[in-house]
Amino acid sequence: KSLKGQFHQDWNFNIVKTGEKLNLGDKELIFVETPMLHWPDNMICYLTQDNMLFSNDAFGQHYATSAIYNDLVDQNELFVECLKYYSNILTPYNSKVIKKIEEILSLNLPLDMICPSHGVIWRDNPTQIVELYLKWAQNYQENQITILYDTMWESTRDMAEAIAKGIKEADSQTVIKLIHLSKKDKNDVITEVFKSKAILVGSPTVNKGILTTIASLFEFVKSLEFKNKQAAAFGSFGWSGESVKLINAKLTDSGFA
């Protein structure tokens, strides 16, 4: 219906489902439905003989590079972009990621290349990104605590820095990320939240509320349905002083313990 609506053509559609094949002569395309990875109508297909998986949105990146293949780009940069993509887009679908990857692996198809819809093509050890997806889908976290804050007159920043110092003194092995939200891209922020075992969120009170940078972040965070992460709120006293109570309520509403 969607294609007909866009192109106004009454083509002879052949609607395929998981396990169906399209004969191309000496090769076949094998189809697997992957709904919500990350669109409802997603599907991947596998090209026999060439052992290529056209993975649609899975295993991709929002990564601008003139190189086509994964072995031709900076590896650290590539995997940062892979993690950012997963964190910001696929986190709510962790259980579906595991289920679909296991379904694909159960087909026992040889795999020489993974071609996502966007980002580099995986030709060097293509299953490495599959293994990472399985790892990330297990409610992933590192030994990291992220402190997120915004500030008006620097007092909330002073609190954030004092908290970071206290954590470091208590546990020097824990990685601490201190992020001033108004100076950081939201997708990078979400990636750090994804990696963290705990977050702390701070804001002063403004008009009986919290700063808009903090409020808008929670709208995004809630939609990602993070699990098994600890959280706490802080804020410098001012105005009517509701910020900590409001942040705690939003943390609870977003699934943080």
Regions found by a protein language model. Give the residues of each.
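Conserved hydrophobic helix-helix packing surfaces used for dimerization/oligomerization
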Residues: L29, M52, I145-I147, A231
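Short acidic loop-to-helix transition motifs that present clustered carboxylates
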Residues: L181-N187
